[in-house]
UniProtKB/Swiss-Prot annotation:
It holds the Pfam family Toxin_cobra-type. One of its GO terms (molecular function) is acetylcholine receptor inhibitor activity. It comes from Naja sputatrix (Malayan spitting cobra). Belongs to the three-finger toxin family. Ancestral subfamily. Orphan group II sub-subfamily. It is found in: Secreted. Disulfide bonds join 24-45, 27-32, 38-63, 67-78, 79-84. This is Weak neurotoxin 10. One of its GO terms (cellular component) is extracellular region.
Amino acid sequence: MKTLLLTLVVVTIVCLDLGYTLTCLNCPEVFCKKFQTCRNGEKICFKKFDERKLFGKRYRRGCAATCPEAKPREIVQCCSTDRCNR
């Protein structure tokens, strides 16, 4: 009986969702390899860049609670899965 109870406790702990933390890219380069673990409440990954520049685009990537607004001539892309803001 104790073995069954212990097994049920272990299975319950393993199956519990102990919280999910989103991971987003966070760097200004086109080919970004730096990751950031988002803070509690940040459920969005974003990527911003200036649409006017063909070469040397400066990207801004990171985590956010909501999708940031685009400024004039700026493109913003948002998503909500791990490392989706490539």
